């Protein structure tokens, strides 16, 4: 029994030290680049945790912007999606089936940036249609586009290839 407790103690100490924060200074690989972090995110009712005021993609976008000193830009449709989860899902499905391009509220001169992080939730195995609206407004030649996607287990679902085709 003592041997097992000793082994468990060592494993716990090793596990804790594995999570210790690295205090070495970070090299900013984006220091000479102008970075945009554009994202679409959903708030409102979430069937797992109730109502949320900030979506997962928004949270990740803020983290990326903080690490890269990038400009944060939220892609927002003119007509907001309903807060109620099922209603939002139904609208998103219809938009995808119709290849809709919902109008977005604002725009940003993406052409002025060298690196664009583009974030979106995976909706029906695709990007939300408002993201396509944003993509199709800009010239992506010579830009480095880095997608990031939030999902509930369906991974990127090939959206990185769709993004490559769209850009």
Regions found by a protein language model. Give the residues of each.
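Bacterial Sec-dependent N-terminal signal peptides
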Residues: 1-23
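Short, glycine/serine-rich, charged loops/turns that create anion-binding
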Residues: 12, 42-45, 122, 152
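N-terminal beta1-alpha1-beta2 submodule of the flavodoxin-like/Rossmannoid cofactor-binding fold
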Residues: 21-115, 125, 132
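Sec/Tat-exported extracytoplasmic proteins
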Residues: 39, 64, 68, 120, ...
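Short, conserved loop/helix-junction motifs that constitute active-site signature segments
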Residues: 110, 136-142, 165-167
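Residues at alpha-helix caps and immediate loop-helix transition turns in enzyme cores, especially N-
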Residues: 127-131, 158-159
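Short, glycine-/small-residue-rich phosphate/pyrophosphate-handling segment
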Residues: 146-167
């Amino acid at each position: 029994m003592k041997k097992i407790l000793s082994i468990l103690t060592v494993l716990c100490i090793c596990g804790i030290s594995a999570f210790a924060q690295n205090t070495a200074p970070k090299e900013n690989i984006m220091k000479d680049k102008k970075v945009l972090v554009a994202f679409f995110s959903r708030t409102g009712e979430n069937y797992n945790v109730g109502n949320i005021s900030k979506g997962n993609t928004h949270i990740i976008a803020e983290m990326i912007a903080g690490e890269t000193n990038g400009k944060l830009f939220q892609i927002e449709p003119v007509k907001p999606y309903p807060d109620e989860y099922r209603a939002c899902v139904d609208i998103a499905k219809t938009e995808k089936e119709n290849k809709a391009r919902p109008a977005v509220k604002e725009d940003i001169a993406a052409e002025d940036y060298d690196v664009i992080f583009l974030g979106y939730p995976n909706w029906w195995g695709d990007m939300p249609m408002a993201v396509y609206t944003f993509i199709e407004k800009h010239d992506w030649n010579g830009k480095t586009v880095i997608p990031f996607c939030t999902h509930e287990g369906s991974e990127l679902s090939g959206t990185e290839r769709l993004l490559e085709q769209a850009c």
